[in-house]
């Protein structure tokens, strides 16, 4: 019998010979991980056996490169993968850990259908805690805070985090809250925003997290940005990033000039509605932005050149300025999710 496919999708993989990062189509099986240059390829470029392997997450071997996980095989070979965003990395980590555990116990991989309890166990589930903190009704309130002639948008204070943990009886005292907050910071669930919090996170203070009203933090997908004395051009540019992130992930995008298809990381924001796309293996600056206000988005069954495509799950965005963009999702379900999310965003704000 063929090993069962547990999870598949685009991740950015570090080359084993050269220090290059490239997007790959990654398939998690019950006994290993296969990775392909393209989703449509039949033969994998490589396979990582999971038996006896160990998983490290978060992996902070690469400085600013976030959402990285490391798999070390029994032959002490390290394999590094980078997800597009935090929840995606956590989903891969959960399934890989479970697959390794099933191999060790001689069991078949099976997902539990029981709903996850929101009440945190003694061993704190940081992923569940993070989701509770982000709850629009009962979570930590995101604020616009001012310090040293700068305005920090969509953030909160270190003491505010501890207050929230204590008031929700998730910790017994502020000292315990400090330990949990430091763990959230090291796992990437919280990010330092102000100079004070950044210096502490870099090891200048005794504790990486500060129970301090002047230490500012933010959620990694919150739409955080900082304003200071800046030119009109900077303000216009920042306007694009004010919106709250409502969806992100990797898609194939067709280039406008060469018409070739490349994997791009997309971040969808609403109010104002923008879809930014990035090189998934590259830096923090977007390669481009699609203004979605008043756009039309539809699924298409053929390539832009009119030929019937072998590739499935294509969709098209036509902006208000009549610029056409073509993308390809990995599955029909994913295409539907993106189309619906873009339609919602296109009706909001500016």
From Swiss-Prot:
Entry-linked Pfam families: DEP, PH
Modified residues (N6-acetyllysine): 64
Gene Ontology terms for molecular function: phosphatidylinositol-3,4-bisphosphate binding; protein homodimerization activity; protein kinase C binding
Domain PH positions: 4-101, 244-347
Function per UniProt: Major protein kinase C substrate of platelets.
PANTHER family: PLECKSTRIN (PTHR12092:SF1)
Name of the protein in question: Pleckstrin
Protein source organism: Rattus norvegicus
High-level lineage: Eukaryota, Metazoa, Chordata, Craniata, Vertebrata
Gene name linked to the record: Plek
């Amino acid at each position: 019998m063929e090993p069962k496919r547990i999870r598949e999708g685009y991740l950015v993989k570090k080359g084993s010979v050269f220090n290059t990062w490239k997007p790959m189509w990654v398939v998690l099986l019950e006994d290993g991980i296969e990775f392909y240059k393209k989703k449509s390829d039949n033969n994998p470029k490589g396979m990582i056996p999971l038996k006896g392997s160990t998983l490290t997450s978060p992996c902070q071997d690469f400085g600013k490169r976030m959402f990285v996980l490391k798999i070390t095989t029994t032959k002490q070979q390290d394999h590094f993968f980078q997800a597009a965003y935090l929840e995606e990395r956590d989903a891969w980590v959960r399934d890989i850990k479970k697959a390794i555990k099933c191999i060790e116990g001689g069991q078949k991989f099976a997902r539990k259908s029981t709903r996850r309890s929101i009440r945190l166990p003694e061993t704190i589930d940081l992923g569940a805690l993070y989701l509770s903190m982000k709850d629009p009704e009962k979570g930590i309130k995101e604020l616009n805070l001012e310090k040293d002639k700068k305005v920090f948008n969509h953030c909160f204070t270190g003491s505010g985090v501890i207050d929230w943990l204590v008031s929700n009886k998730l910790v017994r005292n502020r000292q315990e809250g400090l330990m949990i907050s430091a763990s959230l910071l090291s796992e990437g669930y919280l990010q330092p925003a102000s100079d004070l919090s950044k210096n502490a996170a870099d090891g200048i203070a005794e504790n990486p997290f500060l129970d301090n009203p002047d230490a500012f933090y933010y959620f990694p997908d919150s739409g955080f940005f900082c304003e200071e004395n800046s030119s009109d051009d900077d303000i216009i540019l920042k306007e694009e990033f004010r919106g709250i992130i409502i969806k992100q992930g990797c898609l194939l995008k067709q280039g406008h000039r060469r018409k070739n298809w490349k994997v791009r990381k997309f971040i969808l924001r609403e109010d104002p509605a923008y879809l930014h796309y990035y090189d998934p293996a590259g830096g923090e600056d977007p390669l481009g932005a699609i203004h979605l206000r008043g756009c039309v988005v539809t699924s298409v069954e053929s390539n832009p050149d009119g030929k019937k495509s072998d590739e499935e799950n294509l969709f098209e965005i036509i902006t208000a300025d009549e610029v056409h963009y073509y993308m390809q999702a990995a599955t029909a379900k994913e295409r539907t999710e993106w189309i619906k999310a873009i339609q919602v965003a296109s009706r909001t704000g500016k």
